[in-house]
Amino acid sequence: MTHFPNMAAQIQYFEDSSVVIWHDAVDGIVYRSADEGKSWAPIKGPEQGQAHLFVLHPYDKTQAYILTRSTQHWRTSNRGETWQSFSTPHPPTTLKAMPLDFHPTHHDWILFTGQACTVNLFRKVCHDVAYYTTDGFISDAHPLLDRVEQCHWAKMTPQVAVPEALTQRVLCLAWDVSMSRKRRDTTQLKMFASDDLFQTRQAVVLEDLPNPRGFVNMGRSDQFLIAAVQSDDDELRLYVSRDAETWTRARFPHVVLSHENAYTILEGPKYHLAVDVYDHASRLDGLFISDSTGTNFSLSIADTVRGADGIIDYEHMTHMEGVAIVNVHATGSPARVQTRITHDEGASWTDIPAPTQDLDGKKTSCDRPGCSLPLRAVLAIRNLGHVFPSTAPGIMMGVGSMGDRLRPYGECDTFISTDAGLSWRMVARGPHKHVFADQGGLLVMAADAPSIDVVQYSFDYGTTWTTLALPEAIAPVVITSEPDGTALNSLLQGGRRAKTAHARY
């Protein structure tokens, strides 16, 4: 057991190693463990209080970056064993973009977005500036483009089929030179492409818009690049590209939608796009699945649950082909939330079947029509990572309630499925945090309660559980394990009341 002064903002694992990182964002300290969390020590590099952001390289298992609020930062290329400092012309952006963007095949090609500010007598005015490095900041970063909203390598994922000749292409949302000194006007925001790190640039042309402006955002999903544009009539249009050259407008069925107002791109089937669309005119919130081109969509399921921040109560099962779970408002009763599951990439959805027996082996009363097993999903997440985080195909675990609606979290129980959600059984009364280790061979759970002094683990997919006593009672916060789920160890982070702080374990 190790004591920390504050809860971790991040617990990150270096893939294929025993190295774990604990980022205390309150005190600005990064701790490192080389033995899967058994022992910890502050890293040697940044002074205490400097570690503002910790960023793992998504494509290089050995690289990570620590960004401060100033212009001196730190990098490692050996999983945090040693750190080297580097400088940038400006502090990291705090506006919209993420400060670092990584190339998936050239791991030392990195874009950095910084924030340049001027101060006059009345206010501080800031704008974002993009820089690039092709050697992982061993040498100074070079200017890319001034007054940007965001910049990305066009090959945003390994799956995006950018031609070899365009490997160095960068896409930026930015303003025309004529607009660069004026007030930030997002209606004039354009997308620019450059194949020579913005020595030259050209405005991106869309399928039905030769001179598009009003870009709202851009991003990616597996093999697709996506851009959203606000049209002159206030309609939000979605455009899709698979090669960073040709952009085609996404088409949704007009018999369902009259005016698309908000898009949420979801992690979905491998060769399709999953997009939740909110249409203000019809008050429809629905999940749409594309064909293999990513441009022609059909309604998969309506009345999806959307949070105030636009997050959809949906999760795609990464290691189970075609399987996803979504929460929806019950027909005719929006206050009732129910859960649906698909096993065919959204072509059809069904209720989740409730267990026939409770924890004591007694028959449940949920054998009547309309009675199912609604589950808590993303909007009620009380742990790090996926809500159903199994790297073992077929195994799912979640918190829910039996009945015709999802009950409040404190009234829910904990359930498991070992056949990709076709059948479920109760494994604990009350909500529990849980994690999978050893590729599903080890399950660990802890009651989500104000104070616990035990955890439970199972080596037989939840059929039997062994109780493990904790050295002292804690309030559990997070239980996590190595992302690939192969390790036998898991970490439980919790707290106890102290005079000045919480102790974390």
Feature roles, as predicted:
Residues 1-505:
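Extracellular glycan-interacting surfaces
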